[in-house]
Amino acid sequence: MDLEFFNRILSVDSTSGKEGGLADMLSAEFAASGRKVELFEVGDGTKNLLVSWGTPKLVFCTHLDTVPPYIPCHSERCSGSDASDMAFCGRGTCDAKGQIFAMWEACKALEAQGCTDFGLLLLAGEETGSFGAKAFRDQHPGAEWVVVGEPTDNCMASAAKGTKSFEVAFEGKAFHSGYPENGISAVELFNDFMSALRSIRFPKDELLGETTFNVGKLVSDNPQNILSDSLTCRVYFRTTFESDEMVCNVMKNMAGPEAKLRFGRPRVQDGSDIVAKDVAQWQKAMTVKAFGGDAPTRFETLPGFETKPVSFGSDAPQLNNFAHKILCGPGSILVAHRPEEHILLSDLKQAVANYVRIYKTLMN
């Protein structure tokens, strides 16, 4: 394996918006060997990169960008029982520059064996909305198979959760915090909303498990001695096949003076709910804007590979110009986006073998 090349990939800061530099570096590297290399403008200053051998029927695909901040990379020997292994540490090592490197090594191995009709597709903007994947879908006919590289511990993902994003806003009434009875705190309205949202029982999916949500971009810019007159936030759901439509309906029907959903308060005695007849104050003060997202996705799997469901998103749902999709790659999602992000050399080697095996299983 050309680890010097991997270190060069890791040395390029390709945080979202800056991935064009990595695309240029890789396109020059790949074209120098006489391979067919194409760059596709995404429309926001970034580029997608496609390397082709023959007419691709199978395309290996991952993304160029990484989440901020850029963390310089280094390698170190593992300790204990893994002393013969090596860890590459830093931003993008497993999400997704490890995938870029492993897929490139697999392509070189297939080329050396005289194989053809495959490609390597590197996309911009996966971490910020899959803008590269959406652009490529509209620019290119695709192929029969796409193998999307994400950190799945070298397992084949059987399915992935969907995503749904909503902007939520509350309008309060500012007042001196010593006399809260004369105002309406948008923060308290938000707290009531969160209590109601946590009380909703979304159905558990047999394959993807529970529906979860996270709150981000929370803003209430009031002084500490004045009741908040406004609060905005984003609520981001990870949905399942059972809950995807329900999440949209819940968020649509819980806001505004004419909200269809009613929420109550727990009985002190037995913990059961008293269902309110009227729309709650927090509902009347609440507005919701839906930003959409991806539906939960089922993936193709092959005999002999370990499989598991995953809870993260990828470019795969946007790549509808491919008939069949596989999601598989080295590294662990549990260290992606974190300061301790890393990938093992042994996992990279296993990924190369997996990608070669996938090609031979599907194309032979």
Where are these regions (language model features)?
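Acidic/His- and Gly-rich active-site-bordering loop/insert found
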Residues: M1-T93
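Short glycine-aspartate micro-motif
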Residues: V59, F88, E144-V148, S165-E167, ...
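Glycine/serine-rich anion-binding loops at beta->alpha junctions
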Residues: P68, A87-A102, H176, I326-C328
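Intrinsic disorder/low-complexity segments
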Residues: H74-A87, A112-C115, K277-M286, A295-T297
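Short, conserved micro-motifs enriched in small and acidic residues
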Residues: F88-F101, E127, I184-V187, H342-L345, ...
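Acidic/histidine-rich catalytic neighborhood of metal-dependent amide-processing enzymes
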Residues: K97-S165, D205
